[in-house]
C-alpha cells in the first residue's frame, strides 16, 4: 500500500516539475497570452479582473525603461537571477542590516505565473530554478512583455494597459515619463500605492526612477 502511494506521489511531483517547463515553452509563442495565479484565483472566485493584453511594441518605451530601472537594473545582463545582488542581500542579512529584495523581473514573472504571494523560503527557493529556466527558454523581450501584462497594479488591475487606463485614462503607449515612473514605483506594493494619488515619498522615488530611465540606454538594449 505504502509503495503504491509513494509511486503516485512521485508521479505527481514529476508532473508538477515538468508542467512549468512545458508552459514556458508554450508561453514563448508570441500569440499566447499567459495569466497569473492571482488572476486565476480572481476568476475562480468570480471577482472582477481588469486586464487588457498589449504587445510590448505598443507600450511606451519610457514605461519599460522605468520598470527596469526601478525593479531590476541588471535585467539585460543576468541570466534570470542576479547573483551579485543576491550576495549583497545575504551579506546585509548576515551583518544584521536592513532587509532588501533581490528578486529580478524574471523571478517576479515566474512567481506571478506559477507560485503564490507572501514571504516563504520554499517559494523563494522555487523561484531560482524557474527563473533560470525561463531565461533560457524566453527572450528578454518576451519576459518583459509577459511581466508587464500580468503584474498587479491594484486590486483586480492586471497589466500595464489596464493600469494606464485606470489611473491616467490613457493607453500604455501614451504614458508620460512622470506617469511611467509613478506606475513603476507602485509595483512593490500595489495594494497601498496609488500612482494617480502619489504620496510625497512616492513622488520622490519616482523622480529618481525617471532620471535613471532617461539615462538607461546601455542597460535596456535587450528589449529594443
Swiss-Prot record:
<keyword id="KW-1003">Cell membrane</keyword>
<dbReference type="GO" id="GO:0071555">
    <property type="term" value="P:cell wall organization"/>
</dbReference>
<dbReference type="InterPro" id="IPR036950">
    <property type="entry name" value="PBP_transglycosylase"/>
</dbReference>
<keyword id="KW-0133">Cell shape</keyword>
<keyword id="KW-0808">Transferase</keyword>
<comment type="pathway">
    <text>Cell wall biogenesis; peptidoglycan biosynthesis.</text>
</comment>
<keyword id="KW-0812">Transmembrane</keyword>
<dbReference type="GO" id="GO:0008955">
    <property type="term" value="F:peptidoglycan glycosyltransferase activity"/>
</dbReference>
<keyword id="KW-0961">Cell wall biogenesis/degradation</keyword>
<keyword id="KW-0997">Cell inner membrane</keyword>
<feature type="transmembrane region" description="Helical">
    <location>
        <begin position="12"/>
        <end position="32"/>
    </location>
</feature>
<dbReference type="InterPro" id="IPR001264">
    <property type="entry name" value="Glyco_trans_51"/>
</dbReference>
<dbReference type="GO" id="GO:0009252">
    <property type="term" value="P:peptidoglycan biosynthetic process"/>
</dbReference>
<dbReference type="GO" id="GO:0008360">
    <property type="term" value="P:regulation of cell shape"/>
</dbReference>
<dbReference type="InterPro" id="IPR011812">
    <property type="entry name" value="Pep_trsgly"/>
</dbReference>
<comment type="function">
    <text>Peptidoglycan polymerase that catalyzes glycan chain elongation from lipid-linked precursors.</text>
</comment>
<comment type="similarity">
    <text>Belongs to the glycosyltransferase 51 family.</text>
</comment>
<dbReference type="Pfam" id="PF00912">
    <property type="entry name" value="Transgly"/>
</dbReference>
<keyword id="KW-0472">Membrane</keyword>
<dbReference type="GO" id="GO:0009274">
    <property type="term" value="C:peptidoglycan-based cell wall"/>
</dbReference>
<protein>
    <recommendedName>
        <fullName>Biosynthetic peptidoglycan transglycosylase</fullName>
        <ecNumber>2.4.99.28</ecNumber>
    </recommendedName>
</protein>
<keyword id="KW-0328">Glycosyltransferase</keyword>
<keyword id="KW-1133">Transmembrane helix</keyword>
<dbReference type="GO" id="GO:0005886">
    <property type="term" value="C:plasma membrane"/>
</dbReference>
<keyword id="KW-0573">Peptidoglycan synthesis</keyword>
<dbReference type="InterPro" id="IPR023346">
    <property type="entry name" value="Lysozyme-like_dom_sf"/>
</dbReference>
<dbReference type="GO" id="GO:0016763">
    <property type="term" value="F:pentosyltransferase activity"/>
</dbReference>
Amino acid at each position: 500500500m505504502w509503495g503504491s502511494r509513494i509511486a503516485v506521489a512521485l508521479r505527481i511531483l514529476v508532473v508538477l516539475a515538468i508542467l512549468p517547463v512545458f508552459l514556458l515553452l508554450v508561453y514563448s509563442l508570441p500569440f499566447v497570452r499567459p495569466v497569473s495565479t492571482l488572476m486565476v484565483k480572481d476568476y475562480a472566485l468570480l471577482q472582477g479582473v481588469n486586464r487588457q493584453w498589449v504587445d510590448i511594441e505598443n507600450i511606451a518605451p519610457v514605461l519599460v525603461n522605468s520598470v527596469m530601472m526601478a525593479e531590476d537594473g541588471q535585467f539585460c545582463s543576468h541570466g534570470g537571477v542576479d547573483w551579485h545582488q543576491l550576495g549583497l542581500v545575504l551579506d546585509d542579512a548576515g551583518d544584521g542590516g536592513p532587509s532588501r529584495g533581490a528578486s529580478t523581473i524574471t523571478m517576479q514573472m515566474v512567481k506571478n505565473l506559477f507560485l503564490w504571494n507572501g514571504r516563504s523560503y520554499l517559494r523563494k527557493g522555487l523561484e531560482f530554478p524557474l527563473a533560470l529556466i525561463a531565461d533560457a527558454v524566453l527572450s528578454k523581450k518576451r519576459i518583459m512583455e509577459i511581466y508587464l501584462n500580468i503584474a498587479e497594479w491594484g486590486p483586480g488591475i492586471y497589466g500595464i494597459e489596464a493600469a494606464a487606463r485606470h489611473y491616467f485614462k490613457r493607453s500604455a503607449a501614451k504614458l508620460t515619463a512622470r506617469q511611467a515612473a509613478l506606475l513603476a514605483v507602485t509595483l512593490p506594493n500595489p495594494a497601498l500605492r496609488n500612482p494617480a494619488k502619489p504620496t510625497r515619498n512616492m513622488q520622490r522615488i519616482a523622480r529618481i526612477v525617471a532620471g535613471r530611465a532617461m539615462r538607461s540606454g546601455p542597460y535596456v538594449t535587450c528589449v529594443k
